């Protein structure tokens, strides 16, 4: 039996969109685990893994954001994929050669399919092995439920979970796959990040744990970590410079549409590219 897990945020999206979809497709008796009022997606998923592990009838979990609507049952795809014991995790979209939590920047390696708020992201509907998945929806089997946890205190907030979980699964010797999970609809009507400081904290931690860093790079990583609290001040200074320069009306075609944020995140990604080919798993 495959259950469902959702970290529920403020607002009514879960009750209006996500829960009705789960109820429409889930098998009778299949449990739904919810975590509310959470400060970290990582601790929430650890807790749901613990709850699922305590139920010996559960063979897997479908974990999804609270703004995702299921129109068909992804468990049907997951059951087929998890017949292969070498697989520990399945996503809807993902990629490889990943050096950043922004896995989608590796455009040539993107695989899978999901319908987002404004477009269909279609990189192929077959089954593909990847290094990273998007956590908008992901599936794990019993082995992963029992054996994988995010180390306490290592990661925070809500950014980068899919990439980091995929790395943990691969580091434990299991494969990560993506496949079209049958008409998944992501109703996110906005763009951007839930927390830029958490994003960079998690990215730097992930680099320290899973990439071959030189002593100088490791020192630089720690020093940059100390500057993360100043990110809001950096953004404010850039916004002021744009206003003074008469460019406050500008928009970008990046992840957020905000040129100030997109330039900052783009700079982080360019730093990450020097790590290509140096992942340890």
Swiss-Prot record:
Gene Ontology biological process terms from the UniProt entry: streptomycin biosynthetic process
Pathway in which this enzyme or protein is active: Antibiotic biosynthesis; streptomycin biosynthesis
Keyword hit for Heme: no
Matching InterPro entries: Nucleotide-diphossugar_trans
Keywords: Antibiotic biosynthesis, Streptomycin biosynthesis
Keyword presence, Nucleotide-binding: no
Function of the protein: May be involved in the formation of N-methyl-L-glucosamine.
UniProt-recorded name of the protein: Streptomycin biosynthesis protein StrF
